[in-house]
Amino acid sequence: MAAEASKTGPSRSSYQRMGRKSQPWGAAEIQCTRCGRRVSRSSGHHCELQCGHAFCELCLLMTEECTTIICPDCEVATAVNTRQRYYPMAGYIKEDSIMEKLQPKTIKNCSQDFKKTADQLTTGLERSASTDKTLLNSSAVMLDTNTAEEIDEALNTAHHSFEQLSIAGKALEHMQKQTIEERERVIEVVEKQFDQLLAFFDSRKKNLCEEFARTTDDYLSNLIKAKSYIEEKKNNLNAAMNIARALQLSPSLRTYCDLNQIIRTLQLTSDSELAQVSSPQLRNPPRLSVNCSEIICMFNNMGKIEFRDSTKCYPQENEIRQNVQKKYNNKKELSCYDTYPPLEKKKVDMSVLTSEAPPPPLQPETNDVHLEAKNFQPQKDVATASPKTIAVLPQMGSSPDVIIEEIIEDNVESSAELVFVSHVIDPCHFYIRKYSQIKDAKVLEKKVNEFCNRSSHLDPSDILELGARIFVSSIKNGMWCRGTITELIPIEGRNTRKPCSPTRLFVHEVALIQIFMVDFGNSEVLIVTGVVDTHVRPEHSAKQHIALNDLCLVLRKSEPYTEGLLKDIQPLAQPCSLKDIVPQNSNEGWEEEAKVEFLKMVNNKAVSMKVFREEDGVLIVDLQKPPPNKISSDMPVSLRDALVFMELAKFKSQSLRSHFEKNTTLHYHPPILPKEMTDVSVTVCHINSPGDFYLQLIEGLDILFLLKTIEEFYKSEDGENLEILCPVQDQACVAKFEDGIWYRAKVIGLPGHQEVEVKYVDFGNTAKITIKDVRKIKDEFLNAPEKAIKCKLAYIEPYKRTMQWSKEAKEKFEEKAQDKFMTCSVIKILEDNVLLVELFDSLGAPEMTTTSINDQLVKEGLASYEIGYILKDNSQKHIEVWDPSPEEIISNEVHNLNPVSAKSLPNENFQSLYNKELPVHICNVISPEKIYVQWLLTENLLNSLEEKMIAAYENSKWEPVKWENDMHCAVKIQDKNQWRRGQIIRMVTDTLVEVLLYDVGVELVVNVDCLRKLEENLKTMGRLSLECSLVDIRPAGGSDKWTATACDCLSLYLTGAVATIILQVDSEENNTTWPLPVKIFCRDEKGERVDVSKYLIKKGLALRERRINNLDNSHSLSEKSLEVPLEQEDSVVTNCIKTNFDPDKKTADIISEQKVSEFQEKILEPRTTRGYKPPAIPNMNVFEATVSCVGDDGTIFVVPKLSEFELIKMTNEIQSNLKCLGLLEPYFWKKGEACAVRGSDTLWYRGKVMEVVGGAVRVQYLDHGFTEKIPQCHLYPILLYPDIPQFCIPCQLHNTTPVGNVWQPDAIEVLQQLLSKRQVDIHIMELPKNPWEKLSIHLYFDGMSLSYFMAYYKYCTSEHTEEMLKEKPRSDHDKKYEEEQWEIRFEELLSAETDTPLLPPYLSSSLPSPGELYAVQVKHVVSPNEVYICLDSIETSNQSNQHSDTDDSGVSGESESESLDEALQRVNKKVEALPPLTDFRTEMPCLAEYDDGLWYRAKIVAIKEFNPLSILVQFVDYGSTAKLTLNRLCQIPSHLMRYPARAIKVLLAGFKPPLRDLGETRIPYCPKWSMEALWAMIDCLQGKQLYAVSMAPAPEQIVTLYDDEQHPVHMPLVEMGLADKDE
């Protein structure tokens, strides 16, 4: 309509006819229907159309070519006479005020075409000139006939016309200026947008170049790596060839060497691993792929500047649109660069870029400029806007526009989304909640809880209506939830139906209500208690239901206010159904097992939901495994497929299987194949037939290491965590074999019935197993390639060319090749990586030639040669003579080694082997510093030696021999029935000996019955194993001992492997050290050479230790620099500060220039750990001392009284003289290293490093004895007063053995409380052999022997008790001191507050007569055969009543039937009023507070401590004991004494401590039992109903305990070997 309006034009006659029709001068004003302006009817500047609507001229700007005017409101046409040229301009005289108000932008918006405006103005000028002429020609007549007023009126009209022309000229001038500015701005925007595109292309070009350069660099690095690998292999092969030539030159050496082993070594070091080197292939030439023609075509048509017409002008609406457009344009200018569609995915709609595009709807005019880039569609189709088409900008009016528009493809199926399954009815009816709505769910939960907790309960008169929204306290979901009432059942017999409202009930009339949880999907049934069962149907019982007395407590009615708050949160539960599956048995419906398995796979985890369609509000979906980069999940690839595989469902059409699994199935790397026409060493692992069998390459023990790791992992792993619910074809997995061991496998068949067919990829055999024996494979086990290579024998075919191999041929081939080491000659590599091979038996004697298995089958008539095959010539090859090699030297040295002096080897033995690569066999690994190796050439020697020893000792008889350390012997290995040479390390007991089998490097403990004297002729041969240690590494964690993890890892990695060692030259001495320092290299599973030391460092099990050669004396720093006396050290520091003062430097920096720098250099150099002098023991047998501390191991540290003053003096001098030590560089502390320690009290002490634990160091304060773990920054590696011996002396009690041979924690606690800071008398009994060892003493405190004291309380056992009982003679000073210290005051004992009533002991409970079975409860376990029991509650109550009848204690006021528990409850309520306990006699009854804060009956056992006072009490009703302070004891009310003590101490019959108990941890107070036995007994007694039978009467109660099945409770201990039967 706008286009049609733009084609109309104004005409003089039309305006004259319509504007002046029968309208006299001075008529009333009319109002424009469109803009509302009021125009005088006399002015003629209005148009009254035939339809009756009136418009001003400004609202009807028309061209001369138009013949009709279309009404903008009703669209009725009005004819116009274009031949008349009259155009009235007088009307502008009265409209000047309006024109002044029109802003330039408004004029511009109203104007549609500059040319049209100029034409209109020209017409106006012509009309004005014509009017002037008419006035001049008629002036004479007018003067005669008209008055002067008419002339003035005409002049006034002309004056206003002139002013109007001036205004129009100014408007044109402004439009010209605006147009120029607009052109410049549009050009600027276009340049900016295209500059962004150019920047994008430049960035893309850089990214392409960088990506190509990176890819090329990676490829070149692989080539360089392969090249270096080839050079290394060439060097290794050259060395091996030299060894072989040497053996040929010296035939005598063949008797001592295994020629087959040498040949196999040659093959292993060359051809067997070249396959890995040949993996880098020449890649395809790079090529840049750019669709230039399409891009150029798009650029040629990209962007268009349009001028769109508009005939309507709405100033207010236009202003709003401009503001919105401006915001949108600014946003798009920022995002245009990033959102530009990829060229390969977008297509441009050519119709948009040409003039053929249909005109857009009319919009207000604007000047904003944008780029237009619409997507291509096929040229045959016209681009249409789909619901998914998003226009980036709204369509514009007549203005230069450049539009960006993006078209999004409409997918057939929606993309996957993460969801949670909230409720499952069956696989075709379940509810989900979206993962993206988690925040909404939390907000909803918070709002609902706030409303429900704040609102009041329902009133019984409230009305409940079906379908109404309600809030309910959900049982299953555990929160307040939104719900919908789905069923209401009234109480029987009441008129519950309301008139005209059959679905409404009062709350008090409801018997049963069912509510559907709209946010979870489940339904819950609330049943009113007492309702007749007829109201409850089976479907109600199947759902979550609960019986309530009052429904008002769990229901809240929804209010309009709450609905308004929650209206934005739609129900979160979405009903879903799995696509295209039905129950396995359609007649019976879904089984419960299907729901259980469904929940098992999806419960409590996020899964990926793929939506296919929607039917009646239900989503048809499939639940799948989420993407790995989002959430780790055990979800199967497809839940539908899993249910079908488990035979719980079936497809409507069996062709509807998901193809998603093909892209997610894990696969192994294919096996590494040897090259054609090469020979490799193999083992045949599985045989189907001579034309179908599998072999493994012998590349080391990596396959064994892999298999062992897999077995250990899956044997200990929880099976359900890695269970495969739905296997797919060719899926990599781990499967259990019939031997119970887990191996790598892949799925090759799905026969159904919960079974899968798998192939073991490392062996080649197949098996059909259940799904329970299949597990997911870990990533680290997936990286290794398959080990089994499929092969077929070359040159031969089934006998007489039959189609299949005979059974005899298969059996014969298995007999010759199955599980044997063989040499394989690869003839050709067939399709599907099948090798065509010839097998040779390589286990013959050295002088025998190898035999071909292929030929043997033909000779035995089990196979035939292929047609055209030519027999080979088996002529003997030329024998070459090789040069001598290092191995020949090794063989000679093995014979020359002296086994007796193996730890002081002469230099010439290994001098020639230093820094050479020597092949060895790792026979035993104990730790990184103790590794036993054998030369590869000693295998024959070891076999020969074993034969000699069997001949010498097989029938020998044992004779008593007095064995001593370092004696040589012959040792029989019982489990292997072998004899080995050995050397005694130590005598463990009289019958057990620890020996070293030095030919194989094994240490073990054997019985002396297995030892024989070693004959002299068997000593002539040297040791066949060497002890080595890895260099350049040290234990991690700061300790000087290797961790068990490091030892186990190294043993698993090296034991039994063939490796290469390089003997390292000792940098300090020329003599050979022992163990031999070596570097060990071996091959990993990828065939790469690995340095074992670096391997341990990489695993974090070791740290690198530098080996730095000794510096010259001129460059070394004397260690005495670390021992500068502190006075001198302080002066040196002061001088440094004076002579090198620099205001810009800190003091520490100045010191470091001259002194600290040298100290730091000393730290980094190899250092010898130095320490302080050992303690000086007083030269007297008896001396006084102060106990400084008691160590955790029971060591008593004492400081002699005579040395205390010197210790205080030295400590003060250290604090006053030790100033600034500077900042310490990173320092590696060693165990035993002396240092200066800054303690927790900020004082400096002398110390010694005990252990390095992470970033902290455990140090010992040498002059005080105690240890502490402190940060490394509080240590400094200097010696303080190194000439002064250590002040504190470590001591141990003489001839005193603690329980369990080590001081137990409770004994350590007693020693610490008893001796800390106490003055004691020391009697020296035995001086230590090493001055750093403990001094053996007798210690007396206040005349009491410490050994006797500890033995009395059964913390230890001690000899010479009669000597210890003698008290030390006391002088008069001691007696005076004792009297002063023990001054007795008894005034306070007479006060009334301390009066304690005399109470009788507790009554004891009695057991039934012997032989009677009665129920008991075990209250406390002292040891496995000593417990406290009480009779069952009924019998206890009866006994309590019997005692209360006979009780004449005078206590009254309580009910005779009150039980003990009730009485204690009443006492606990007013325990604050009870008086404190003041009488601490043994067996004194009292009330004691237990750990639970309640008070129970107890009695005093002993006083444990005096400062503070601690009392040991026993709870008489339970048997347990506790050490309590005074505030936890009070006097017992007398009425509680009438109840007998419930706990009865009994001994258990039927078992006793075992004679041989290997448990290391003993019960401290009962060392004959182990802690393991105690815990096992507690497990047997806990949580069971027990019965007892008395075996012996009081005083020593002995009973036998039985469980509820009448079995003795101690039998599990006997079966576990923790106890022996007591007959």
From Swiss-Prot:
InterPro entries: RNF17-like_TUDOR_rpt1, RNF17-like_TUDOR_rpt2, RNF17-like_TUDOR_rpt3, RNF17-like_TUDOR_rpt4, RNF17-like_TUDOR_rpt5, SNase_OB-fold_sf, Tudor, Znf_RING
Family matches, as Gene3D superfamilies: 2.30.30.140, 2.40.50.90
Domain Tudor as annotated: residue spans: 726-784, 962-1021, 1228-1285, 1479-1539
Pfam families documented for this protein: TUDOR (PF00567)
Subcellular location: Cytoplasm; Nucleus
Entries under SUPFAM superfamilies matching the protein: RING/U-box, Staphylococcal nuclease, Tudor/PWWP/MBT
Region feature Disordered, mapped onto this chain: 1-22, 1438-1462
Keywords: Acetylation, Cytoplasm, Developmental protein, Differentiation, Metal-binding, Nucleus, Repeat, Spermatogenesis, Zinc, Zinc-finger
Function (record text): Seems to be involved in regulation of transcriptional activity of MYC. In vitro, inhibits DNA-binding activity of Mad-MAX heterodimers. Can recruit Mad transcriptional repressors (MXD1, MXD3, MXD4 and MXI1) to the cytoplasm. May be involved in spermiogenesis.
Assembly description: Interacts with MXD1, MXD3, MXD4, MXI1 and PIWIL1. Self-associates.
UniProt protein name: RING finger protein 17
Organism: Homo sapiens (Human)
Lineage: Eukaryota, Metazoa, Chordata, Craniata, Vertebrata
